[in-house]
Amino acid sequence: MAARRAFSRNIPALSQRLPLRASRSSFLATMAPNSQSNTAVRRLHATSKHFNAAATSTASSYPTSHEQIKTPEDTPNFLNNKFTASQASTWFDLYDPATNNLVTRVPQSTDAELKAAVDAAEKAFPAWKATSVMSRQQIMFKYVALIRENWDRLAASITLEQGKTVADAKGDVLRGLQVAEGACGIPEQMKGEVLEVAKDMETRTYREPLGVVAAICPFNFPAMIPLWCVPVATMTGNTIVVKPSERDPGAMMILAELAAKAGFPEGVINIIHGAAPTVDFIIDEPRIKAISFVGSNKAGEYIFTRGSANGKRVQANLGAKNHAAIMPDCNKNHALNAIAGAAFGAAGQRCMALSTCVMVGETKDWLPELAERAKGLSINGGFEAGADLGPVISPEAKKRIEGLIASAEEEGATILLDGRGYVPEKYPNGNWVGPTIIANVKPHMRCYTEEIFGPVLVCLNVETTDDAINLINANEYGNGTAIFTRSGPTAARFQSEVEAGQMGINVPIPVPLPMFSFTGNKKSIAGGGASTFYGKPGINFYTQIKTVTSLWRSEDAIETKAKTIMPTHS
Protein backbone atom coordinates (compact mmCIF):
# COMPACT_ATOMS: atom_id res chain seq x y z
CA MET A 1 0.00 0.00 0.00
CA ALA A 2 1.20 3.50 -0.76
CA ALA A 3 1.89 6.01 1.95
CA ARG A 4 -1.21 7.88 3.02
CA ARG A 5 -2.00 11.21 4.55
CA ALA A 6 -5.25 12.38 6.11
CA PHE A 7 -6.85 15.35 4.44
CA SER A 8 -9.45 16.34 7.02
CA ARG A 9 -9.11 19.06 9.60
CA ASN A 10 -11.17 21.16 11.92
CA ILE A 11 -14.64 20.00 10.88
CA PRO A 12 -16.36 17.79 13.46
CA ALA A 13 -17.99 15.57 10.85
CA LEU A 14 -14.56 14.91 9.40
CA SER A 15 -12.47 14.94 12.54
CA GLN A 16 -11.43 11.33 12.10
CA ARG A 17 -8.65 11.40 9.53
CA LEU A 18 -9.55 9.31 6.52
CA PRO A 19 -6.88 8.45 3.95
CA LEU A 20 -6.95 9.11 0.26
CA ARG A 21 -6.27 6.10 -1.91
CA ALA A 22 -2.74 6.29 -3.21
CA SER A 23 -3.17 4.37 -6.45
CA ARG A 24 -4.62 6.43 -9.32
CA SER A 25 -5.93 6.52 -12.85
CA SER A 26 7.27 32.75 -20.13
CA PHE A 27 6.85 33.27 -20.55
CA LEU A 28 6.29 29.62 -20.58
CA ALA A 29 8.64 28.94 -17.77
CA THR A 30 8.62 32.45 -16.40
CA MET A 31 5.09 33.54 -17.22
CA ALA A 32 2.94 30.43 -17.65
CA PRO A 33 -0.16 30.18 -15.45
CA ASN A 34 0.95 30.55 -11.85
CA SER A 35 4.33 29.01 -12.46
CA GLN A 36 7.96 29.75 -11.98
CA SER A 37 10.82 29.03 -14.33
CA ASN A 38 13.24 26.17 -14.07
CA THR A 39 16.00 27.05 -16.47
CA ALA A 40 18.80 24.74 -15.39
CA VAL A 41 21.06 23.51 -18.16
CA ARG A 42 20.31 19.84 -18.76
CA ARG A 43 20.85 16.65 -20.73
CA LEU A 44 17.77 15.64 -22.60
CA HIS A 45 15.69 13.46 -24.78
CA ALA A 46 13.97 14.55 -27.98
CA THR A 47 10.40 13.51 -27.41
CA SER A 48 9.66 13.06 -31.09
CA LYS A 49 12.61 10.70 -31.47
CA HIS A 50 11.88 8.79 -28.29
CA PHE A 51 8.30 8.15 -29.35
CA ASN A 52 9.15 7.21 -32.94
CA ALA A 53 11.02 3.92 -33.18
CA ALA A 54 12.46 3.58 -36.66
CA ALA A 55 11.25 0.09 -37.55
CA THR A 56 7.90 0.00 -35.78
CA SER A 57 4.54 1.67 -36.01
CA THR A 58 4.63 5.15 -34.56
CA ALA A 59 1.19 4.46 -33.13
CA SER A 60 2.54 1.66 -30.93
CA SER A 61 5.96 2.98 -29.87
CA TYR A 62 5.70 5.14 -26.80
CA PRO A 63 6.37 4.97 -23.05
CA THR A 64 3.80 3.35 -20.79
CA SER A 65 5.45 3.90 -17.42
CA HIS A 66 7.36 6.46 -15.39
CA GLU A 67 10.55 4.43 -15.65
CA GLN A 68 13.62 6.62 -15.89
CA ILE A 69 14.89 7.26 -19.40
CA LYS A 70 18.47 6.03 -19.52
CA THR A 71 19.73 8.23 -22.34
CA PRO A 72 17.57 11.34 -22.65
CA GLU A 73 17.83 13.18 -25.95
CA ASP A 74 17.49 16.87 -26.71
CA THR A 75 14.27 18.23 -28.16
CA PRO A 76 14.90 19.67 -31.64
CA ASN A 77 13.33 22.50 -33.57
CA PHE A 78 11.01 21.62 -36.46
CA LEU A 79 11.68 23.57 -39.65
CA ASN A 80 10.62 22.77 -43.21
CA ASN A 81 9.18 19.41 -42.14
CA LYS A 82 12.47 18.33 -40.55
CA PHE A 83 13.59 17.92 -36.96
CA THR A 84 16.69 20.07 -36.63
CA ALA A 85 19.07 19.93 -33.68
CA SER A 86 19.34 23.26 -31.93
CA GLN A 87 22.65 25.05 -31.49
CA ALA A 88 21.34 26.63 -28.30
CA SER A 89 23.62 27.58 -25.43
CA THR A 90 20.71 27.67 -22.95
CA TRP A 91 18.52 24.65 -22.23
CA PHE A 92 15.50 23.97 -20.05
CA ASP A 93 15.46 20.69 -18.16
CA LEU A 94 12.13 18.89 -18.50
CA TYR A 95 11.28 16.48 -15.68
CA ASP A 96 8.54 13.87 -15.30
CA PRO A 97 6.29 15.53 -12.67
CA ALA A 98 5.57 12.15 -11.04
CA THR A 99 9.24 11.31 -10.43
CA ASN A 100 11.29 14.41 -11.26
CA ASN A 101 13.44 12.19 -13.48
CA LEU A 102 14.92 13.95 -16.49
CA VAL A 103 12.91 13.41 -19.67
CA THR A 104 14.51 15.81 -22.14
CA ARG A 105 16.17 19.18 -22.56
CA VAL A 106 14.33 21.88 -24.46
CA PRO A 107 16.41 24.57 -26.17
CA GLN A 108 16.16 28.29 -26.01
CA SER A 109 16.17 28.44 -29.80
CA THR A 110 18.88 30.72 -31.12
CA ASP A 111 18.20 33.99 -32.91
CA ALA A 112 19.18 32.34 -36.18
CA GLU A 113 16.80 29.44 -35.54
CA LEU A 114 13.92 31.78 -34.70
CA LYS A 115 14.53 33.71 -37.89
CA ALA A 116 14.82 30.50 -39.91
CA ALA A 117 11.37 29.41 -38.75
CA VAL A 118 9.80 32.64 -39.97
CA ASP A 119 11.83 32.47 -43.19
CA ALA A 120 10.43 29.00 -43.82
CA ALA A 121 6.86 30.08 -43.09
CA GLU A 122 7.19 33.20 -45.23
CA LYS A 123 8.60 31.24 -48.15
CA ALA A 124 5.84 28.63 -47.93
CA PHE A 125 2.96 31.12 -47.68
CA PRO A 126 2.39 32.12 -51.35
CA ALA A 127 2.13 28.54 -52.57
CA TRP A 128 0.04 27.46 -49.57
CA LYS A 129 -2.33 30.38 -50.06
CA ALA A 130 -2.68 29.40 -53.71
CA THR A 131 -3.36 25.76 -52.84
CA SER A 132 -7.00 24.96 -53.51
CA VAL A 133 -9.31 24.65 -50.54
CA MET A 134 -10.09 21.08 -51.58
CA SER A 135 -6.41 20.14 -51.55
CA ARG A 136 -5.95 21.70 -48.13
CA GLN A 137 -9.04 19.86 -46.95
CA GLN A 138 -7.67 16.50 -48.13
CA ILE A 139 -4.47 17.11 -46.16
CA MET A 140 -6.52 17.96 -43.08
CA PHE A 141 -8.55 14.76 -43.47
CA LYS A 142 -5.28 12.79 -43.45
CA TYR A 143 -4.01 14.78 -40.48
CA VAL A 144 -7.14 13.98 -38.48
CA ALA A 145 -6.79 10.29 -39.30
CA LEU A 146 -3.13 10.25 -38.22
CA ILE A 147 -3.94 11.97 -34.94
CA ARG A 148 -6.53 9.29 -34.24
CA GLU A 149 -4.03 6.55 -35.08
CA ASN A 150 -1.51 8.13 -32.71
CA TRP A 151 -3.98 9.04 -29.98
CA ASP A 152 -2.43 6.76 -27.35
CA ARG A 153 1.05 7.89 -28.28
CA LEU A 154 0.13 11.55 -27.90
CA ALA A 155 -1.56 10.85 -24.57
CA ALA A 156 1.53 9.01 -23.32
CA SER A 157 3.68 12.01 -24.16
CA ILE A 158 1.35 14.25 -22.16
CA THR A 159 1.34 11.89 -19.18
CA LEU A 160 5.13 11.65 -19.16
CA GLU A 161 5.82 15.37 -19.52
CA GLN A 162 2.79 17.11 -18.03
CA GLY A 163 1.62 14.58 -15.43
CA LYS A 164 -2.01 14.00 -16.42
CA THR A 165 -3.53 10.58 -16.11
CA VAL A 166 -3.61 8.66 -19.37
CA ALA A 167 -7.41 8.94 -19.50
CA ASP A 168 -7.29 12.69 -18.97
CA ALA A 169 -4.48 13.05 -21.50
CA LYS A 170 -6.63 11.25 -24.05
CA GLY A 171 -9.32 13.84 -23.36
CA ASP A 172 -6.75 16.58 -23.95
CA VAL A 173 -6.02 15.09 -27.38
CA LEU A 174 -9.69 14.53 -28.18
CA ARG A 175 -10.75 18.12 -27.51
CA GLY A 176 -8.03 19.30 -29.87
CA LEU A 177 -8.86 16.62 -32.42
CA GLN A 178 -12.46 17.82 -32.46
CA VAL A 179 -11.23 21.26 -33.57
CA ALA A 180 -9.14 19.64 -36.31
CA GLU A 181 -12.18 17.66 -37.44
CA GLY A 182 -14.24 20.84 -37.46
CA ALA A 183 -11.55 22.58 -39.48
CA CYS A 184 -12.17 20.13 -42.32
CA GLY A 185 -15.42 22.04 -42.88
CA ILE A 186 -13.81 25.47 -43.04
CA PRO A 187 -14.15 25.75 -46.86
CA GLU A 188 -17.92 25.91 -46.37
CA GLN A 189 -17.50 28.75 -43.87
CA MET A 190 -15.00 30.64 -46.04
CA LYS A 191 -17.52 31.31 -48.79
CA GLY A 192 -17.90 34.97 -49.62
CA GLU A 193 -20.89 37.10 -50.58
CA VAL A 194 -21.81 38.79 -53.83
CA LEU A 195 -24.46 41.30 -54.80
CA GLU A 196 -25.31 43.07 -58.06
CA VAL A 197 -25.31 46.63 -56.74
CA ALA A 198 -26.06 48.46 -60.02
CA LYS A 199 -26.42 47.78 -63.71
CA ASP A 200 -23.38 45.79 -64.87
CA MET A 201 -21.78 46.23 -61.43
CA GLU A 202 -21.31 43.76 -58.61
CA THR A 203 -19.63 43.80 -55.22
CA ARG A 204 -18.20 40.68 -53.65
CA THR A 205 -16.45 40.03 -50.36
CA TYR A 206 -14.29 37.08 -49.47
CA ARG A 207 -11.76 36.08 -46.85
CA GLU A 208 -8.02 35.84 -47.39
CA PRO A 209 -5.31 34.50 -45.08
CA LEU A 210 -3.10 36.90 -43.16
CA GLY A 211 0.27 35.30 -43.91
CA VAL A 212 2.62 34.04 -41.20
CA VAL A 213 0.94 33.64 -37.80
CA ALA A 214 2.22 32.33 -34.47
CA ALA A 215 0.91 30.36 -31.50
CA ILE A 216 2.33 30.56 -27.96
CA CYS A 217 1.00 27.57 -26.03
CA PRO A 218 0.73 26.79 -22.28
CA PHE A 219 1.82 23.72 -20.35
CA ASN A 220 -1.59 22.58 -19.18
CA PHE A 221 -2.98 21.37 -22.53
CA PRO A 222 -0.01 20.24 -24.64
CA ALA A 223 -2.17 18.87 -27.47
CA MET A 224 -5.49 20.69 -27.24
CA ILE A 225 -4.22 24.27 -27.42
CA PRO A 226 -1.89 23.72 -30.39
CA LEU A 227 -4.82 22.03 -32.11
CA TRP A 228 -6.99 25.05 -31.40
CA CYS A 229 -4.53 26.99 -33.57
CA VAL A 230 -2.78 24.89 -36.21
CA PRO A 231 -5.82 23.42 -38.03
CA VAL A 232 -7.77 26.68 -38.20
CA ALA A 233 -4.75 28.76 -39.16
CA THR A 234 -3.60 26.42 -41.91
CA MET A 235 -7.03 25.57 -43.33
CA THR A 236 -7.64 29.29 -43.82
CA GLY A 237 -4.41 29.47 -45.84
CA ASN A 238 -1.88 30.76 -43.33
CA THR A 239 1.49 29.33 -42.38
CA ILE A 240 2.32 29.07 -38.69
CA VAL A 241 5.18 29.15 -36.20
CA VAL A 242 4.35 27.35 -32.95
CA LYS A 243 6.08 27.81 -29.62
CA PRO A 244 4.93 24.98 -27.35
CA SER A 245 5.58 25.23 -23.64
CA GLU A 246 9.16 24.38 -22.78
CA ARG A 247 7.67 22.35 -19.94
CA ASP A 248 6.04 19.78 -22.25
CA PRO A 249 6.63 20.23 -26.00
CA GLY A 250 6.50 16.52 -26.83
CA ALA A 251 2.89 16.37 -27.98
CA MET A 252 3.41 19.27 -30.39
CA MET A 253 6.53 17.60 -31.77
CA ILE A 254 4.49 14.49 -32.51
CA LEU A 255 1.74 16.61 -34.07
CA ALA A 256 4.35 18.24 -36.32
CA GLU A 257 5.67 14.85 -37.41
CA LEU A 258 2.12 13.76 -38.24
CA ALA A 259 1.48 16.98 -40.16
CA ALA A 260 4.44 16.27 -42.42
CA LYS A 261 3.16 12.72 -42.99
CA ALA A 262 -0.30 14.07 -43.79
CA GLY A 263 1.14 16.12 -46.65
CA PHE A 264 1.54 19.64 -45.29
CA PRO A 265 4.23 21.23 -47.48
CA GLU A 266 7.58 22.31 -46.08
CA GLY A 267 7.39 25.52 -44.08
CA VAL A 268 3.66 25.53 -43.44
CA ILE A 269 4.09 24.36 -39.82
CA ASN A 270 7.27 25.17 -37.87
CA ILE A 271 8.24 24.78 -34.20
CA ILE A 272 10.61 26.86 -32.12
CA HIS A 273 11.29 26.74 -28.40
CA GLY A 274 12.16 28.93 -25.47
CA ALA A 275 10.92 31.36 -22.88
CA ALA A 276 10.83 35.18 -22.82
CA PRO A 277 13.34 35.76 -25.67
CA THR A 278 11.26 33.60 -28.02
CA VAL A 279 8.07 35.36 -27.00
CA ASP A 280 9.64 38.76 -27.58
CA PHE A 281 10.87 37.63 -30.98
CA ILE A 282 7.36 36.57 -31.97
CA ILE A 283 5.89 39.84 -30.75
CA ASP A 284 8.43 42.03 -32.53
CA GLU A 285 8.98 40.09 -35.78
CA PRO A 286 7.15 42.20 -38.40
CA ARG A 287 6.48 39.27 -40.73
CA ILE A 288 4.30 37.60 -38.09
CA LYS A 289 0.82 39.06 -38.56
CA ALA A 290 -1.13 37.48 -35.69
CA ILE A 291 -0.46 35.80 -32.35
CA SER A 292 -2.56 33.25 -30.49
CA PHE A 293 -1.81 32.85 -26.78
CA VAL A 294 -3.22 30.91 -23.83
CA GLY A 295 -1.70 31.37 -20.38
CA SER A 296 -1.39 33.68 -17.42
CA ASN A 297 -2.61 37.25 -17.16
CA LYS A 298 0.91 38.54 -16.66
CA ALA A 299 2.12 37.02 -19.91
CA GLY A 300 -1.06 37.52 -21.89
CA GLU A 301 -1.54 41.17 -21.06
CA TYR A 302 2.09 41.83 -21.98
CA ILE A 303 1.76 39.96 -25.28
CA PHE A 304 -1.53 41.64 -26.12
CA THR A 305 -0.31 45.15 -25.34
CA ARG A 306 3.06 44.90 -27.05
CA GLY A 307 1.77 42.81 -29.95
CA SER A 308 -1.11 45.20 -30.61
CA ALA A 309 1.27 48.15 -30.47
CA ASN A 310 3.28 46.40 -33.19
CA GLY A 311 0.18 46.20 -35.38
CA LYS A 312 -0.51 42.50 -34.88
CA ARG A 313 -3.77 40.75 -34.23
CA VAL A 314 -3.64 39.08 -30.82
CA GLN A 315 -6.07 36.57 -29.32
CA ALA A 316 -5.16 35.90 -25.69
CA ASN A 317 -7.01 33.68 -23.22
CA LEU A 318 -5.83 34.46 -19.70
CA GLY A 319 -6.50 33.47 -16.08
CA ALA A 320 -9.73 32.41 -14.45
CA LYS A 321 -11.61 31.94 -11.21
CA ASN A 322 -14.56 29.82 -12.26
CA HIS A 323 -17.52 29.75 -9.87
CA ALA A 324 -20.31 27.23 -9.44
CA ALA A 325 -23.47 28.28 -7.63
CA ILE A 326 -25.00 25.31 -5.77
CA MET A 327 -28.73 25.77 -5.24
CA PRO A 328 -30.65 23.85 -2.53
CA ASP A 329 -33.06 22.42 -5.10
CA CYS A 330 -30.37 20.84 -7.29
CA ASN A 331 -29.74 17.14 -7.83
CA LYS A 332 -27.34 16.80 -4.91
CA ASN A 333 -25.62 13.62 -6.02
CA HIS A 334 -25.01 14.93 -9.53
CA ALA A 335 -23.76 18.28 -8.24
CA LEU A 336 -21.29 16.80 -5.75
CA ASN A 337 -19.86 14.39 -8.31
CA ALA A 338 -19.60 17.12 -10.93
CA ILE A 339 -17.88 19.52 -8.55
CA ALA A 340 -15.33 16.96 -7.38
CA GLY A 341 -14.45 16.00 -10.93
CA ALA A 342 -14.24 19.55 -12.26
CA ALA A 343 -12.29 20.90 -9.29
CA PHE A 344 -9.67 18.16 -9.00
CA GLY A 345 -9.34 16.67 -12.48
CA ALA A 346 -5.96 17.38 -14.09
CA ALA A 347 -4.84 18.38 -10.57
CA GLY A 348 -6.81 21.59 -11.04
CA GLN A 349 -4.49 22.78 -13.82
CA ARG A 350 -7.22 23.80 -16.24
CA CYS A 351 -8.24 27.32 -17.20
CA MET A 352 -11.82 26.06 -16.90
CA ALA A 353 -11.31 24.16 -13.64
CA LEU A 354 -14.18 24.68 -11.24
CA SER A 355 -12.10 26.31 -8.52
CA THR A 356 -14.78 28.14 -6.51
CA CYS A 357 -18.07 26.91 -5.04
CA VAL A 358 -20.77 29.34 -3.98
CA MET A 359 -22.85 27.42 -1.46
CA VAL A 360 -26.34 28.92 -1.41
CA GLY A 361 -28.35 28.54 1.79
CA GLU A 362 -28.37 25.09 3.34
CA THR A 363 -26.01 23.62 0.73
CA LYS A 364 -23.06 24.63 2.93
CA ASP A 365 -23.98 21.60 5.02
CA TRP A 366 -23.10 19.37 2.05
CA LEU A 367 -19.40 20.15 2.22
CA PRO A 368 -18.44 17.23 4.50
CA GLU A 369 -20.00 14.84 1.99
CA LEU A 370 -18.14 16.58 -0.84
CA ALA A 371 -14.91 16.11 1.10
CA GLU A 372 -15.64 12.39 1.47
CA ARG A 373 -16.02 12.07 -2.29
CA ALA A 374 -12.79 13.94 -2.88
CA LYS A 375 -11.04 11.53 -0.51
CA GLY A 376 -12.15 8.69 -2.75
CA LEU A 377 -10.15 10.02 -5.67
CA SER A 378 -6.99 8.10 -6.49
CA ILE A 379 -3.79 10.17 -6.67
CA ASN A 380 -0.87 8.51 -8.42
CA GLY A 381 1.44 8.49 -11.40
CA GLY A 382 -0.51 9.06 -14.59
CA PHE A 383 0.40 5.69 -16.10
CA GLU A 384 -0.98 3.81 -13.08
CA ALA A 385 -4.32 2.06 -13.58
CA GLY A 386 -7.23 3.73 -11.83
CA ALA A 387 -5.55 7.08 -11.27
CA ASP A 388 -7.93 10.04 -11.02
CA LEU A 389 -5.37 12.83 -10.80
CA GLY A 390 -1.63 13.12 -10.98
CA PRO A 391 1.03 15.57 -9.82
CA VAL A 392 1.23 19.27 -10.48
CA ILE A 393 3.68 20.43 -13.11
CA SER A 394 6.70 21.40 -10.99
CA PRO A 395 8.09 21.73 -7.46
CA GLU A 396 7.67 25.49 -7.81
CA ALA A 397 3.97 25.08 -8.62
CA LYS A 398 3.55 22.77 -5.62
CA LYS A 399 5.22 25.30 -3.34
CA ARG A 400 2.98 28.09 -4.60
CA ILE A 401 -0.21 26.05 -4.19
CA GLU A 402 0.70 24.99 -0.66
CA GLY A 403 1.55 28.60 0.17
CA LEU A 404 -1.95 29.70 -0.86
CA ILE A 405 -3.49 26.94 1.27
CA ALA A 406 -1.41 28.16 4.22
CA SER A 407 -2.51 31.74 3.58
CA ALA A 408 -6.14 30.65 3.83
CA GLU A 409 -5.47 29.18 7.27
CA GLU A 410 -3.73 32.37 8.35
CA GLU A 411 -6.65 34.50 7.14
CA GLY A 412 -9.24 32.47 9.05
CA ALA A 413 -10.62 29.99 6.52
CA THR A 414 -11.19 26.33 7.40
CA ILE A 415 -9.11 23.64 5.71
CA LEU A 416 -11.82 21.04 5.39
CA LEU A 417 -9.70 18.65 3.34
CA ASP A 418 -5.92 19.08 3.31
CA GLY A 419 -3.89 17.72 0.41
CA ARG A 420 -0.53 19.00 1.55
CA GLY A 421 2.13 16.42 2.20
CA TYR A 422 0.51 13.61 0.25
CA VAL A 423 3.10 11.20 -1.19
CA PRO A 424 2.27 7.98 -3.10
CA GLU A 425 4.63 5.25 -1.97
CA LYS A 426 5.71 4.36 -5.51
CA TYR A 427 6.57 7.95 -6.46
CA PRO A 428 8.07 9.71 -3.44
CA ASN A 429 9.83 12.38 -5.49
CA GLY A 430 6.85 13.71 -7.44
CA ASN A 431 5.12 17.08 -7.21
CA TRP A 432 2.13 15.91 -5.19
CA VAL A 433 -0.75 17.96 -3.85
CA GLY A 434 -3.90 16.06 -2.94
CA PRO A 435 -7.46 17.38 -3.30
CA THR A 436 -7.96 20.29 -0.92
CA ILE A 437 -11.23 21.95 0.13
CA ILE A 438 -11.16 25.31 1.89
CA ALA A 439 -14.40 26.33 3.60
CA ASN A 440 -15.61 29.61 5.12
CA VAL A 441 -13.67 31.63 2.56
CA LYS A 442 -14.20 35.39 2.33
CA PRO A 443 -13.79 37.45 -0.85
CA HIS A 444 -10.73 39.33 0.45
CA MET A 445 -8.65 36.18 1.05
CA ARG A 446 -5.72 35.40 -1.24
CA CYS A 447 -7.05 31.91 -1.93
CA TYR A 448 -10.06 33.61 -3.53
CA THR A 449 -8.47 36.61 -5.23
CA GLU A 450 -5.65 34.62 -6.87
CA GLU A 451 -5.87 31.83 -9.42
CA ILE A 452 -4.49 28.81 -7.54
CA PHE A 453 -4.10 26.49 -10.55
CA GLY A 454 -4.00 23.37 -8.43
CA PRO A 455 -6.35 20.77 -6.89
CA VAL A 456 -7.86 23.27 -4.47
CA LEU A 457 -11.56 24.15 -4.16
CA VAL A 458 -12.48 27.30 -2.25
CA CYS A 459 -16.02 27.54 -0.88
CA LEU A 460 -17.96 30.67 0.03
CA ASN A 461 -21.35 30.74 1.74
CA VAL A 462 -24.21 33.02 0.67
CA GLU A 463 -27.88 33.11 1.57
CA THR A 464 -29.69 33.89 -1.68
CA THR A 465 -29.48 33.69 -5.45
CA ASP A 466 -29.01 37.47 -5.51
CA ASP A 467 -25.99 37.10 -3.26
CA ALA A 468 -24.51 34.41 -5.50
CA ILE A 469 -24.94 36.50 -8.65
CA ASN A 470 -23.47 39.59 -7.01
CA LEU A 471 -20.48 37.66 -5.70
CA ILE A 472 -19.70 36.13 -9.08
CA ASN A 473 -20.10 39.43 -10.91
CA ALA A 474 -17.80 41.20 -8.46
CA ASN A 475 -14.95 38.86 -9.37
CA GLU A 476 -12.57 40.25 -11.98
CA TYR A 477 -12.43 37.03 -14.01
CA GLY A 478 -15.10 35.83 -16.43
CA ASN A 479 -13.92 32.68 -18.16
CA GLY A 480 -16.74 30.41 -17.07
CA THR A 481 -19.35 29.71 -14.45
CA ALA A 482 -21.97 27.09 -13.62
CA ILE A 483 -25.18 26.70 -11.68
CA PHE A 484 -26.67 23.50 -10.31
CA THR A 485 -30.44 23.74 -9.97
CA ARG A 486 -33.72 22.06 -10.92
CA SER A 487 -35.43 25.42 -11.40
CA GLY A 488 -35.77 26.67 -14.96
CA PRO A 489 -36.54 30.27 -13.91
CA THR A 490 -33.54 30.33 -11.56
CA ALA A 491 -31.27 29.02 -14.30
CA ALA A 492 -32.67 31.52 -16.80
CA ARG A 493 -32.08 34.41 -14.43
CA PHE A 494 -28.55 33.22 -13.67
CA GLN A 495 -27.85 32.86 -17.38
CA SER A 496 -29.07 36.39 -18.05
CA GLU A 497 -27.48 38.24 -15.15
CA VAL A 498 -24.13 36.57 -14.52
CA GLU A 499 -21.15 38.15 -16.26
CA ALA A 500 -19.13 35.23 -17.58
CA GLY A 501 -18.42 34.23 -21.13
CA GLN A 502 -19.19 30.51 -20.80
CA MET A 503 -21.92 29.13 -18.63
CA GLY A 504 -22.96 25.65 -17.62
CA ILE A 505 -26.41 24.80 -16.33
CA ASN A 506 -25.90 21.55 -14.42
CA VAL A 507 -22.68 21.28 -16.47
CA PRO A 508 -19.46 21.89 -14.51
CA ILE A 509 -16.96 22.61 -17.31
CA PRO A 510 -18.90 24.26 -20.16
CA VAL A 511 -16.12 24.35 -22.78
CA PRO A 512 -17.91 24.75 -26.14
CA LEU A 513 -17.48 22.28 -28.96
CA PRO A 514 -15.77 23.47 -32.17
CA MET A 515 -18.92 24.62 -33.94
CA PHE A 516 -19.06 27.36 -31.29
CA SER A 517 -16.14 29.32 -29.81
CA PHE A 518 -14.24 29.62 -26.52
CA THR A 519 -15.77 32.85 -25.26
CA GLY A 520 -14.39 33.98 -21.92
CA ASN A 521 -14.76 37.61 -20.94
CA LYS A 522 -13.72 40.24 -18.38
CA LYS A 523 -10.13 39.78 -17.21
CA SER A 524 -10.03 36.24 -18.60
CA ILE A 525 -9.51 37.39 -22.18
CA ALA A 526 -7.50 40.29 -23.51
CA GLY A 527 -9.08 42.94 -25.68
CA GLY A 528 -12.60 42.59 -24.38
CA GLY A 529 -13.22 39.20 -25.96
CA ALA A 530 -13.18 40.42 -29.56
CA SER A 531 -10.89 37.61 -30.74
CA THR A 532 -11.73 34.13 -29.48
CA PHE A 533 -10.51 30.66 -30.38
CA TYR A 534 -11.99 28.31 -32.99
CA GLY A 535 -15.51 28.37 -34.41
CA LYS A 536 -16.47 31.28 -36.68
CA PRO A 537 -14.57 33.83 -34.56
CA GLY A 538 -11.44 31.70 -34.96
CA ILE A 539 -11.81 31.75 -38.74
CA ASN A 540 -12.33 35.50 -38.65
CA PHE A 541 -9.21 35.95 -36.52
CA TYR A 542 -6.97 34.20 -39.04
CA THR A 543 -8.43 35.91 -42.12
CA GLN A 544 -9.06 39.37 -43.49
CA ILE A 545 -11.94 40.48 -45.68
CA LYS A 546 -11.32 41.72 -49.19
CA THR A 547 -14.14 43.58 -50.93
CA VAL A 548 -14.09 43.91 -54.73
CA THR A 549 -16.43 46.07 -56.77
CA SER A 550 -16.33 45.40 -60.52
CA LEU A 551 -17.96 47.03 -63.52
CA TRP A 552 -18.32 45.24 -66.84
CA ARG A 553 -20.33 47.48 -69.11
CA SER A 554 -22.63 45.79 -71.56
CA GLU A 555 -22.22 48.76 -73.92
CA ASP A 556 -19.43 51.19 -74.72
CA ALA A 557 -19.19 54.41 -72.75
CA ILE A 558 -20.24 57.45 -74.80
CA GLU A 559 -19.49 60.26 -72.37
CA THR A 560 -16.22 62.15 -72.84
CA LYS A 561 -16.24 64.24 -69.67
CA ALA A 562 -15.03 62.83 -66.34
CA LYS A 563 -17.33 63.07 -63.32
CA THR A 564 -15.85 64.29 -60.04
CA ILE A 565 -18.83 63.79 -57.76
CA MET A 566 -18.90 60.91 -55.28
CA PRO A 567 -20.10 57.80 -57.13
CA THR A 568 -23.35 56.39 -55.76
CA HIS A 569 -23.71 53.40 -58.12
CA SER A 570 -27.40 54.14 -58.40
Locations of regions flagged by a protein language model:
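N-terminal mitochondrial targeting presequence
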Residues: 1-59
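Conserved C-terminal structural/oligomerization subdomain of aldehyde/semialdehyde dehydrogenase
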Residues: 4, 45, 101-104, 288, ...
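Hydrophobic face of amphipathic alpha-helices that form TPR/SEL1-like repeat modules
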Residues: 38-41, 45-98
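Residue-level signal for inorganic ion chemistry
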Residues: 100, 136, 158, 180, ...
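Glycine-rich loop-to-alpha-helix module at the N-terminal edge of alpha/beta enzyme cores
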Residues: 101-190, 200
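Short, well-ordered beta-strand elements within core beta-sheets of diverse protein domains
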Residues: 103-109, 124-130, 215, 324-327, ...
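Rossmann-like NAD(P) dinucleotide-binding subdomain of oxidoreductase/dehydrogenase enzymes
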Residues: 191-334, 462
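ALDH superfamily catalytic-core signature
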Residues: 298-442, 466, 471, 505, ...
